[in-house]
Protein backbone atom coordinates (compact mmCIF):
# COMPACT_ATOMS: atom_id res chain seq x y z
CA UNK A 1 0.00 0.00 0.00
CA UNK A 2 1.09 3.58 -0.77
CA UNK A 3 2.95 5.17 2.15
CA UNK A 4 2.99 7.63 3.76
CA UNK A 5 -0.77 8.30 3.66
CA UNK A 6 -0.55 12.01 4.33
CA UNK A 7 -2.41 14.77 2.51
CA UNK A 8 -2.62 18.54 2.83
CA UNK A 9 -5.74 20.53 1.93
CA UNK A 10 -5.55 24.27 1.34
CA UNK A 11 -8.88 25.91 2.13
CA UNK A 12 -11.59 25.05 4.63
CA UNK A 13 -14.82 25.71 2.75
CA UNK A 14 -17.33 23.02 1.84
CA UNK A 15 -15.02 21.23 -0.60
CA UNK A 16 -12.03 21.34 1.73
CA UNK A 17 -13.94 20.24 4.82
CA UNK A 18 -15.77 17.45 2.97
CA UNK A 19 -12.49 16.18 1.52
CA UNK A 20 -10.85 16.31 4.94
CA UNK A 21 -13.64 14.26 6.53
CA UNK A 22 -13.70 11.57 3.83
CA UNK A 23 -9.93 11.25 3.56
CA UNK A 24 -9.45 11.06 7.32
CA UNK A 25 -12.13 8.35 7.41
CA UNK A 26 -10.29 6.65 4.54
CA UNK A 27 -7.10 6.28 6.55
CA UNK A 28 -5.20 9.44 5.64
CA UNK A 29 -3.53 11.84 8.03
CA UNK A 30 -5.11 15.10 6.91
CA UNK A 31 -3.80 18.61 7.53
CA UNK A 32 -6.07 21.47 6.49
CA UNK A 33 -5.01 25.11 6.13
CA UNK A 34 -7.65 27.81 6.60
CA UNK A 35 -6.99 31.54 7.02
CA UNK A 36 -9.90 32.23 9.37
CA UNK A 37 -11.10 30.54 12.55
CA UNK A 38 -14.55 28.99 12.62
CA UNK A 39 -17.30 30.00 12.79
CA UNK A 40 -17.38 32.87 10.29
CA UNK A 41 -19.57 34.21 7.49
CA UNK A 42 -18.85 33.85 3.78
CA UNK A 43 -20.35 35.43 0.66
CA UNK A 44 -22.72 32.65 -0.37
CA UNK A 45 -26.38 32.22 -1.28
CA UNK A 46 -26.70 29.56 1.45
CA UNK A 47 -29.17 27.43 -0.49
CA UNK A 48 -28.16 23.79 -0.79
CA UNK A 49 -29.83 21.58 -3.38
CA UNK A 50 -31.23 18.36 -1.93
CA UNK A 51 -28.97 16.41 -4.27
CA UNK A 52 -26.42 16.75 -1.43
CA UNK A 53 -28.77 15.87 1.43
CA UNK A 54 -28.43 12.04 1.48
CA UNK A 55 -24.64 12.33 1.49
CA UNK A 56 -24.66 14.82 4.37
CA UNK A 57 -27.09 12.61 6.27
CA UNK A 58 -24.79 9.62 5.72
CA UNK A 59 -22.16 11.44 7.79
CA UNK A 60 -24.61 11.57 10.70
CA UNK A 61 -24.10 15.32 11.02
CA UNK A 62 -27.46 15.99 12.72
CA UNK A 63 -28.23 18.83 10.33
CA UNK A 64 -31.83 19.03 11.53
CA UNK A 65 -30.66 20.27 14.93
CA UNK A 66 -29.44 23.47 13.23
CA UNK A 67 -32.96 24.27 12.02
CA UNK A 68 -32.47 24.57 8.24
CA UNK A 69 -35.40 25.73 6.12
CA UNK A 70 -37.03 23.44 3.55
CA UNK A 71 -37.35 25.07 0.13
CA UNK A 72 -39.46 23.79 -2.76
CA UNK A 73 -40.64 26.93 -4.61
CA UNK A 74 -38.83 29.33 -6.95
CA UNK A 75 -39.79 32.87 -7.87
CA UNK A 76 -38.11 35.09 -10.48
CA UNK A 77 -38.91 38.82 -10.69
CA UNK A 78 -38.11 41.65 -13.10
CA UNK A 79 -37.63 45.41 -12.90
CA UNK A 80 -41.08 45.91 -14.42
CA UNK A 81 -42.68 43.96 -11.61
CA UNK A 82 -43.33 40.69 -13.44
CA UNK A 83 -42.99 37.45 -11.48
CA UNK A 84 -42.50 33.86 -12.56
CA UNK A 85 -43.09 31.07 -10.06
CA UNK A 86 -42.28 27.38 -10.32
CA UNK A 87 -41.94 24.25 -8.24
CA UNK A 88 -38.50 22.88 -7.47
CA UNK A 89 -39.03 19.11 -7.84
CA UNK A 90 -35.87 18.15 -5.95
CA UNK A 91 -35.92 21.18 -3.67
CA UNK A 92 -33.28 22.18 -1.20
CA UNK A 93 -32.65 23.68 2.20
CA UNK A 94 -31.34 26.97 3.54
CA UNK A 95 -28.56 27.04 6.13
CA UNK A 96 -25.88 29.64 6.80
CA UNK A 97 -22.25 28.88 6.08
CA UNK A 98 -21.57 30.18 9.59
CA UNK A 99 -23.46 27.16 10.95
CA UNK A 100 -22.75 24.53 8.28
CA UNK A 101 -19.01 25.09 7.96
CA UNK A 102 -18.62 25.09 11.73
CA UNK A 103 -20.55 21.81 11.97
CA UNK A 104 -18.26 20.19 9.39
CA UNK A 105 -15.18 21.65 11.10
CA UNK A 106 -16.15 20.22 14.50
CA UNK A 107 -16.90 16.84 12.92
CA UNK A 108 -13.56 16.79 11.07
CA UNK A 109 -11.66 17.82 14.19
CA UNK A 110 -13.22 14.96 16.17
CA UNK A 111 -12.05 12.56 13.46
CA UNK A 112 -8.49 13.77 13.97
CA UNK A 113 -8.02 16.23 11.11
CA UNK A 114 -5.24 18.71 11.94
CA UNK A 115 -6.30 22.33 11.38
CA UNK A 116 -3.72 25.06 10.85
CA UNK A 117 -5.27 28.52 10.83
CA UNK A 118 -2.63 30.09 8.62
CA UNK A 119 -2.44 31.61 5.16
CA UNK A 120 -0.61 29.52 2.58
CA UNK A 121 1.83 31.71 0.66
CA UNK A 122 3.32 29.21 -1.76
CA UNK A 123 3.09 25.63 -3.01
CA UNK A 124 5.96 23.90 -4.81
CA UNK A 125 6.18 20.36 -6.16
CA UNK A 126 9.74 19.03 -5.93
CA UNK A 127 11.06 15.47 -6.13
CA UNK A 128 7.60 13.95 -5.84
CA UNK A 129 6.72 15.95 -2.72
CA UNK A 130 4.65 19.10 -2.20
CA UNK A 131 6.19 21.86 -0.12
CA UNK A 132 3.49 24.10 1.35
CA UNK A 133 4.83 27.37 2.73
CA UNK A 134 2.90 29.31 5.35
CA UNK A 135 3.88 32.11 7.72
CA UNK A 136 4.97 29.53 10.29
CA UNK A 137 7.09 27.25 8.16
CA UNK A 138 7.18 24.66 5.39
CA UNK A 139 5.03 21.53 5.41
CA UNK A 140 5.62 18.52 3.18
CA UNK A 141 3.11 16.07 1.77
CA UNK A 142 3.01 13.59 -1.13
CA UNK A 143 -0.52 14.75 -2.03
CA UNK A 144 -2.23 18.13 -1.90
CA UNK A 145 -5.68 19.51 -2.69
CA UNK A 146 -6.42 23.16 -3.49
CA UNK A 147 -9.90 24.00 -2.19
CA UNK A 148 -9.36 27.65 -1.37
CA UNK A 149 -12.41 28.99 -3.16
CA UNK A 150 -13.17 31.47 -5.88
CA UNK A 151 -9.88 33.38 -6.06
CA UNK A 152 -6.52 33.38 -4.27
CA UNK A 153 -2.99 34.72 -4.51
CA UNK A 154 -2.04 31.11 -5.27
CA UNK A 155 -3.92 31.32 -8.59
CA UNK A 156 -1.45 33.97 -9.66
CA UNK A 157 1.52 31.82 -8.60
CA UNK A 158 0.21 28.99 -10.78
CA UNK A 159 -0.44 31.46 -13.63
CA UNK A 160 -4.01 30.21 -14.00
CA UNK A 161 -5.46 31.96 -17.04
CA UNK A 162 -8.71 33.16 -15.45
CA UNK A 163 -6.75 35.13 -12.85
CA UNK A 164 -5.45 37.53 -15.51
CA UNK A 165 -8.87 38.18 -17.05
CA UNK A 166 -10.52 40.82 -14.88
CA UNK A 167 -13.97 39.65 -13.84
CA UNK A 168 -16.76 42.24 -13.94
CA UNK A 169 -18.66 40.74 -10.98
CA UNK A 170 -18.83 41.40 -7.26
CA UNK A 171 -20.90 39.60 -4.61
CA UNK A 172 -22.63 41.09 -1.56
CA UNK A 173 -24.34 39.17 1.25
CA UNK A 174 -26.60 40.16 4.15
CA UNK A 175 -28.51 38.29 6.81
CA UNK A 176 -31.91 39.85 7.36
CA UNK A 177 -35.21 39.43 9.15
CA UNK A 178 -38.14 39.76 6.76
CA UNK A 179 -41.59 38.46 5.89
CA UNK A 180 -41.32 35.98 3.03
CA UNK A 181 -42.54 32.38 2.68
CA UNK A 182 -40.22 29.93 4.41
CA UNK A 183 -40.27 27.50 1.46
CA UNK A 184 -39.38 30.05 -1.25
CA UNK A 185 -36.15 31.04 -2.95
CA UNK A 186 -36.61 34.25 -4.94
CA UNK A 187 -34.37 35.65 -7.68
CA UNK A 188 -34.79 39.40 -8.22
CA UNK A 189 -33.27 40.87 -11.36
CA UNK A 190 -31.81 44.33 -11.79
CA UNK A 191 -29.65 46.04 -14.39
CA UNK A 192 -26.25 44.37 -14.30
CA UNK A 193 -27.07 41.65 -11.80
CA UNK A 194 -29.53 39.67 -9.74
CA UNK A 195 -30.27 38.92 -6.12
CA UNK A 196 -31.33 35.76 -4.30
CA UNK A 197 -33.20 35.58 -1.02
CA UNK A 198 -34.15 32.50 0.99
CA UNK A 199 -34.79 31.52 4.58
CA UNK A 200 -31.97 29.99 6.60
CA UNK A 201 -31.94 29.08 10.33
CA UNK A 202 -33.35 30.95 13.35
CA UNK A 203 -35.96 32.96 11.40
CA UNK A 204 -33.17 34.64 9.42
CA UNK A 205 -33.02 35.07 5.66
CA UNK A 206 -30.02 35.20 3.38
CA UNK A 207 -29.96 38.09 0.89
CA UNK A 208 -27.08 37.75 -1.55
CA UNK A 209 -26.61 39.48 -4.88
CA UNK A 210 -24.23 39.45 -7.81
CA UNK A 211 -23.62 42.77 -9.54
CA UNK A 212 -21.34 44.11 -12.21
CA UNK A 213 -18.69 46.24 -10.53
CA UNK A 214 -19.52 48.98 -13.04
CA UNK A 215 -22.68 49.61 -11.02
CA UNK A 216 -20.64 50.39 -7.92
CA UNK A 217 -18.24 52.68 -9.76
CA UNK A 218 -21.13 55.00 -10.63
CA UNK A 219 -22.00 55.65 -6.99
CA UNK A 220 -20.40 56.43 -3.63
CA UNK A 221 -20.62 53.09 -1.90
CA UNK A 222 -22.76 49.98 -1.80
CA UNK A 223 -25.83 51.52 -0.14
CA UNK A 224 -26.05 54.28 -2.76
CA UNK A 225 -25.71 51.70 -5.53
CA UNK A 226 -28.49 49.61 -3.99
CA UNK A 227 -30.75 52.65 -3.77
CA UNK A 228 -30.20 53.62 -7.40
CA UNK A 229 -29.87 50.25 -9.11
CA UNK A 230 -31.38 47.39 -7.10
CA UNK A 231 -34.40 49.37 -5.93
CA UNK A 232 -35.59 49.77 -9.52
CA UNK A 233 -36.98 46.27 -9.09
CA UNK A 234 -40.11 46.83 -6.96
CA UNK A 235 -39.73 43.46 -5.25
CA UNK A 236 -36.18 44.30 -4.19
CA UNK A 237 -37.13 47.81 -3.12
CA UNK A 238 -39.87 46.43 -0.88
CA UNK A 239 -37.46 43.85 0.53
CA UNK A 240 -34.81 46.44 1.39
CA UNK A 241 -37.34 48.88 2.86
CA UNK A 242 -39.20 46.29 4.96
CA UNK A 243 -36.43 44.11 6.40
CA UNK A 244 -34.17 44.32 9.43
CA UNK A 245 -30.52 44.01 8.39
CA UNK A 246 -28.31 42.08 10.82
CA UNK A 247 -24.56 41.97 11.48
CA UNK A 248 -23.84 45.55 10.42
CA UNK A 249 -21.87 45.75 7.18
CA UNK A 250 -22.39 43.14 4.46
CA UNK A 251 -19.89 40.51 3.42
CA UNK A 252 -18.36 41.52 0.06
CA UNK A 253 -16.17 39.72 -2.47
CA UNK A 254 -14.75 41.06 -5.73
CA UNK A 255 -13.47 39.53 -8.96
CA UNK A 256 -15.88 36.58 -9.09
CA UNK A 257 -15.03 34.54 -12.19
CA UNK A 258 -17.20 31.93 -13.92
CA UNK A 259 -14.59 31.12 -16.55
CA UNK A 260 -13.49 27.50 -16.96
CA UNK A 261 -10.57 26.62 -14.68
CA UNK A 262 -7.91 23.94 -14.75
CA UNK A 263 -8.42 20.92 -12.50
CA UNK A 264 -4.73 20.07 -12.09
CA UNK A 265 -1.63 22.28 -11.94
CA UNK A 266 1.75 20.60 -11.42
CA UNK A 267 -0.01 17.64 -9.75
CA UNK A 268 -1.97 19.90 -7.37
CA UNK A 269 -5.62 18.78 -7.43
CA UNK A 270 -8.24 21.55 -7.51
CA UNK A 271 -11.66 21.03 -5.97
CA UNK A 272 -14.84 23.04 -5.30
CA UNK A 273 -14.96 26.65 -6.53
CA UNK A 274 -11.20 26.46 -7.13
CA UNK A 275 -11.93 23.97 -9.92
CA UNK A 276 -14.86 25.84 -11.45
CA UNK A 277 -17.78 27.91 -10.24
CA UNK A 278 -21.39 27.60 -11.39
CA UNK A 279 -23.34 30.83 -11.68
CA UNK A 280 -25.24 31.60 -8.44
CA UNK A 281 -28.68 31.75 -10.07
CA UNK A 282 -28.49 27.98 -10.62
CA UNK A 283 -28.69 27.51 -6.86
CA UNK A 284 -26.46 24.49 -6.45
CA UNK A 285 -22.89 25.72 -6.07
CA UNK A 286 -22.75 24.36 -2.52
CA UNK A 287 -23.92 20.93 -3.65
CA UNK A 288 -21.34 20.88 -6.44
CA UNK A 289 -18.56 21.76 -3.98
CA UNK A 290 -19.57 18.86 -1.72
CA UNK A 291 -20.06 16.44 -4.62
CA UNK A 292 -16.71 17.29 -6.25
CA UNK A 293 -14.98 16.68 -2.92
CA UNK A 294 -16.66 13.29 -2.63
CA UNK A 295 -15.58 12.32 -6.15
CA UNK A 296 -11.97 13.40 -5.63
CA UNK A 297 -11.66 11.82 -2.18
CA UNK A 298 -12.99 8.46 -3.37
CA UNK A 299 -10.52 8.46 -6.27
CA UNK A 300 -7.58 9.31 -3.98
CA UNK A 301 -8.54 6.62 -1.46
CA UNK A 302 -8.83 4.00 -4.18
CA UNK A 303 -5.48 4.88 -5.77
CA UNK A 304 -3.78 4.96 -2.36
CA UNK A 305 -4.42 1.23 -2.02
CA UNK A 306 -1.80 0.55 -4.70
CA UNK A 307 1.81 -0.18 -3.76
CA UNK A 308 2.95 2.93 -5.61
CA UNK A 309 1.03 6.09 -6.40
CA UNK A 310 0.30 6.51 -10.12
CA UNK A 311 -0.30 10.26 -10.25
CA UNK A 312 -1.08 10.30 -13.95
CA UNK A 313 -3.77 7.64 -13.61
CA UNK A 314 -5.29 9.39 -10.58
CA UNK A 315 -5.34 12.73 -12.39
CA UNK A 316 -6.84 11.26 -15.58
CA UNK A 317 -9.63 9.61 -13.62
CA UNK A 318 -10.41 12.79 -11.68
CA UNK A 319 -10.45 14.90 -14.84
CA UNK A 320 -12.76 12.44 -16.58
CA UNK A 321 -15.23 12.07 -13.72
CA UNK A 322 -15.30 15.78 -12.86
CA UNK A 323 -15.85 16.71 -16.51
CA UNK A 324 -18.63 14.16 -16.99
CA UNK A 325 -20.43 15.28 -13.85
CA UNK A 326 -20.04 19.06 -13.88
CA UNK A 327 -18.79 20.47 -17.18
CA UNK A 328 -22.18 20.66 -18.92
CA UNK A 329 -23.86 22.04 -15.82
CA UNK A 330 -21.33 24.86 -15.47
CA UNK A 331 -21.59 25.63 -19.18
CA UNK A 332 -25.40 25.70 -18.94
CA UNK A 333 -25.13 28.04 -15.96
CA UNK A 334 -22.95 30.47 -17.91
CA UNK A 335 -25.49 30.46 -20.75
CA UNK A 336 -28.49 31.00 -18.47
CA UNK A 337 -26.74 33.88 -16.73
CA UNK A 338 -26.89 35.79 -20.02
CA UNK A 339 -30.68 35.81 -19.61
CA UNK A 340 -30.37 37.69 -16.32
CA UNK A 341 -29.01 41.12 -15.46
CA UNK A 342 -30.15 42.66 -18.75
CA UNK A 343 -33.62 44.17 -18.15
CA UNK A 344 -34.96 43.65 -21.68
CA UNK A 345 -33.71 40.07 -22.05
CA UNK A 346 -34.93 39.23 -18.55
CA UNK A 347 -38.43 40.54 -19.28
CA UNK A 348 -38.63 38.42 -22.43
CA UNK A 349 -37.18 35.33 -20.73
CA UNK A 350 -39.60 35.53 -17.80
CA UNK A 351 -42.55 36.02 -20.16
CA UNK A 352 -41.54 33.03 -22.31
CA UNK A 353 -40.78 30.73 -19.39
CA UNK A 354 -44.04 31.71 -17.71
CA UNK A 355 -45.94 30.37 -20.71
CA UNK A 356 -43.76 27.27 -21.12
CA UNK A 357 -43.51 25.52 -17.74
CA UNK A 358 -41.98 22.42 -19.34
CA UNK A 359 -39.07 24.53 -20.63
CA UNK A 360 -38.71 26.06 -17.19
CA UNK A 361 -38.34 22.61 -15.62
CA UNK A 362 -35.89 21.54 -18.31
CA UNK A 363 -33.60 24.48 -17.45
CA UNK A 364 -33.69 23.53 -13.77
CA UNK A 365 -32.70 19.95 -14.64
CA UNK A 366 -29.84 21.12 -16.90
CA UNK A 367 -28.15 22.92 -14.02
CA UNK A 368 -28.85 20.39 -11.26
CA UNK A 369 -27.51 16.90 -10.82
CA UNK A 370 -28.89 13.71 -9.35
CA UNK A 371 -28.85 12.78 -5.70
CA UNK A 372 -25.37 11.54 -4.73
Language-model segments: residues:
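N-terminal Rossmann-fold NAD(P) dinucleotide-binding loop
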Residues: 16-17
Amino acid sequence: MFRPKKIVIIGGGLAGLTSAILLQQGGFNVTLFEKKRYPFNRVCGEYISNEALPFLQSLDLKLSELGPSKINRLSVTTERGKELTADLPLGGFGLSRYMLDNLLFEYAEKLGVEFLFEKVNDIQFRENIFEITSANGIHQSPLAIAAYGKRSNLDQKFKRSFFYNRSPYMGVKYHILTDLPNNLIRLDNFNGGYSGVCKIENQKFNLCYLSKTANLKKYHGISEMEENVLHKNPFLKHLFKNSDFLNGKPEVINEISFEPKSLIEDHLLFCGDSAGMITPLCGNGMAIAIHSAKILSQIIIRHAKAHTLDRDALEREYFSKWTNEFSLRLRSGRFIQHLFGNPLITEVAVAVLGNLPALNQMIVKKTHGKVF
